[in-house]
Amino acid sequence: MSGLLYALLIIPMIGIFFILSFDSYNFNITSNNSNSGSFSEAGAGKNSGGELLKVLVINNELNFYKKIAFITTIMNLIVSLIIYILFDFSTNQFQFVQDALELSVYNIYLGVDGLSIYFVLLTTIIMPIALISNWNSITHNIKAYLIIILLLETLLLAVFLVLDVLLFYIFFESILPPLFILIGLFGSSNKVRASFYIFLYTFNLKCKRAKYRGSPKALVTKVQHESVELAWLMTQGMVKSLVDIWVIAVLSHPCLRTESKQEGVKEQRVDGSSSSRNLEFVRCTLVAGKPVLGRKIHHCPCGPASSKLMKVQGYYNITTQAATYTHPLSTLDPWFITGFVDAEGCFMIGLTKSELYRSGYQVTAIFKISLRRTRKDYTLLCQIRDYFGIGIITKHGETTLQYMVRSIKDLNVILSHFDAYPLFSQKRSDYILFKQAIVLIKNKEHLTK
């Protein structure tokens, strides 16, 4: 039983070898006499008995190729059924593990687990069904069709059996060329276009929005509806406050720059633009240490910084009064609020359209919690609003609700809560930078000179 997995890969290759080994018959149809191999006409018209015999022999030959391919797939199905019967579902370890002799400097390991065994069985079931369903519909390039089918079976099984990441990637990408040819040659309408589509889609060549990583000013990624370009924002000096925020983050205490990673914390999306009614702003990510969109902010292993005084050397001293704030209408535990914001909350600095400013934009600090538009989530957002006694709940799209706090006065209540009940995940770094940004806004140091 030690070679069952190798048999799954070798049997289709043997079938390909047999199909390639049998050459087409050569027919020399002449019109001399019966002794020289000629055939007399069998009926009216231009059809001769020799041509009829040639067609019959060719059909028999093509059926012979199809039978070889079908028998090959059936043999593979039998082997996969044996593996399935002998598979021990009581363990989560790889089974039937086999290693090949060393090839150059690389070893090949095969094995199946409780998940891949079903894909192996499904592949070996689909292949004979595919051959039967196209037994009479494929009338040209029969040998090429059968060889591609058997080659695809080998590559698919290799994807599910190999235990090496590199070989998994190689076999997975190797499926694309034969699949491209199979669809392009034997597909129905628009087969060429379909083959290109599946090839490009699988290669994942979709155009992605570039994330600028060259300077701190690139914290501003894109304005909603692409009405304002990043370069224009930079030349107009509209991102000065964001640059200051980044500099403060770089020079902050080492807790913000630690590389330790906390597991089990839900990660949120941090890039992209957003809009709410007539509010259009650039979604900015406050990243500790580096101005890179989408990078995780790591949690300090030594615990959160002091909530009463945080010193940023050479820039600002930010002192806050730690106060407990609980609205009498709310029954939520303060630590529940903190934990919930750790998972679902968001601290943002945005550029809001405003005609009151020369640049046409106003720097806005926003705290929000987004949930799905369900009765249960709406009730929870109402309880959070009652807890703080501030903020509004709005619809955001067709499926989302948002609890939002924007004014500096109301944000002081938010800051007081998280100073008294600090965040413990990597989102605490977001909060600290958000807090520094509010100080800049209060001191009007964010304005363009």
Curated annotation (Swiss-Prot):
A GO biological process held by the record: ATP synthesis coupled electron transport
Keyword Mitochondrion appears in the UniProt entry: yes
Gene Ontology CC: one annotated term: mitochondrion
Keywords: Mitochondrion
GO molecular function terms attached to this record: endonuclease activity; NADH dehydrogenase (ubiquinone) activity; ubiquinone binding
Keyword Mitochondrion applies: yes
Compartments it resides in: Mitochondrion
Predominant cellular place of this UniProt entry's protein: mitochondrion
PANTHER family: NADH-UBIQUINONE OXIDOREDUCTASE CHAIN 4
Protein name (record): Uncharacterized 50.9 kDa protein in ND4 intron 1
The organism of origin for this protein: Podospora anserina (strain S / ATCC MYA-4624 / DSM 980 / FGSC 10383) (Pleurage anserina)
